[in-house]
Amino acid sequence: MSNKVKSDIEIASKAEILPVTTIAEHLGLDADALELYGKYKAKLSYDTIHSLKDKETGKLVLVTAINPTPAGEGKSTVTVGLGDALSKKDKKTVIALREPSLGPTMGIKGGATGGGYAQVIPMEDINLHFTGDFHAITAANNALSAFIDNHMQQGNDLDIDGRRIVWKRVVDLNDRALRKVVVGLGGPIQGVPREDGFDITVASEIMAIICLASDLKDLKKRLSEIVIGYNYKKEPITVGEMGYEGALTLLLKDALKPNLVQTLEHTPAIVHGGPFANIAHGCNSVSATSTALRLGEYVVTEAGFGADLGAEKFLDIKVPALGKAPDCVVIVATIRALKMHGGALKTELSEENVDALAKGFTNLQKHTESIQTFGIPYVVAINKFITDSDAEVAKLEALCEEHGIPFSLTEVWEKGGDGGLELADKVIAAVESGEADYKRIYDDAWSIEEKLEAIVTKVYGGIGVELSSKAQKQIVEFKKYGWDRYPICMAKTQYSLSDDPTLLGRPTDFVIHIREFIPKLGAGFVVALTGDVMTMPGLPKKPAALNMDVDENGNAQGLF
């Protein structure tokens, strides 16, 4: 390979891309199994998905990470590279990823399809509008908002209290100006004035429902169970009571179908759904993972941000819906993130600092312990960056060996699948060891307080939770309605094990502050909002969009 560092879009645009029908053939599927979106993208038809239901499932590998820097630590890159490496080991492999959100793409990340020589393609299409799933979810979400406001305008038979509507509008962008808005202004014919707000699309309950629904029937049932707000007696009102679950299902019927694409090395990739892991459950769809498990011998998937967020939610929320636990977990660690956790300034992460690396190692240790709590074998993937010094690499390897942590130095960004062959060997060994003995860290029958304590003490390393007066009142209300039986989905900063983004490394003796709960009954969980986490992000001072353009031939520039 050339010594010149090429951008992701340069690498992707020069790659040989096979027709998606050829990729399907690798999986034993013919063209009739696909609904084509051009030559290189397709949805898997419902008939195809149903025909696979009785097939034996393959082995499942979950990729997670330590607490990241703002730029991310390469989870998607390692997921893709490991998938390609397993393919090189003659394992029939399928990768299952989330779809990127336009908000972070235009904001800070510039894209989310892997990186370097470990990418899914067509990269430009996937990072932008892809097959329209997010637009369908946005439309369905906002249609429900329109139905709610229209119901209030047209007599309000359900006595919806406009002050207690919890359903928000969404847009798939980072737009802080829309966090709080007032709708219905302009006089009697314009609607009923009320406070409203926007979340980013990936935080929508409908996104979570798409990712947890098993089929159309389940989708419709889940949509009917969405709580949109409360009446004047403070009783919950659902979509089913309003009667719009059928219309919403109609809008989402194609968005529920998984999307098939490929990696640079032509490993099949099913890319579907995209909830964030800090404000939602952070996993791709059950439909995508389940289908992949019936098409491949090995399936490599990922869960957002660190093991305290995406992996915990995968293991406590997605696994029960999927009916299959991981056979191995890969924890991605980078030297730059460990240096940050050891006290190095974010502006100095490219500079050698072995002492900071050693201090930050405790963050990695905590995540390995958390995964062991779930009873699953793991391997640490040291995702090598070109800024890592030999001394830093040697120090991290020595620390892993000293503490008995299985690891592999991984160079898939630079070398593609060839850079992950050792990691593939260690993953195969872990899977074939049969050591996986999955166990959730709490039971659904536990109280909300007990579930919170389990997550905070066993996964975060804290000492307990502190509930606001609002959260305490909500728990009493939730018990009355039986909502305390649902799993907990923590909305928390991704940068720290605590709810304070400045508390790095492996903090101890901290409590998690729960400010309020949001019942998401259609998704099947209760969201616990901690700290200052927001469900509508803002843009940075210099968004990645400043460097994006298109040439005279319509080719994208500036995606990375």
Curated annotation (Swiss-Prot):
Keyword Transit peptide: no
GO molecular function: ATP binding; formate-tetrahydrofolate ligase activity
Keywords noted in UniProt: ATP-binding, Ligase, Nucleotide-binding, One-carbon metabolism
GO BP terms, alphabetized: tetrahydrofolate interconversion
Pfam families: FTHFS
Binding site for ATP: 69-76
SUPFAM superfamilies, per the entry: P-loop containing nucleoside triphosphate hydrolases
Known catalytic reactions: (6S)-5,6,7,8-tetrahydrofolate + formate + ATP = (6R)-10-formyltetrahydrofolate + ADP + phosphate
Organism superkingdom: Bacteria
UniProt KW Transmembrane helix keyword: no
EC number(s) given by UniProt: 6.3.4.3
Family, as annotated: Belongs to the formate--tetrahydrofolate ligase family.
Name of the featured protein: Formate--tetrahydrofolate ligase
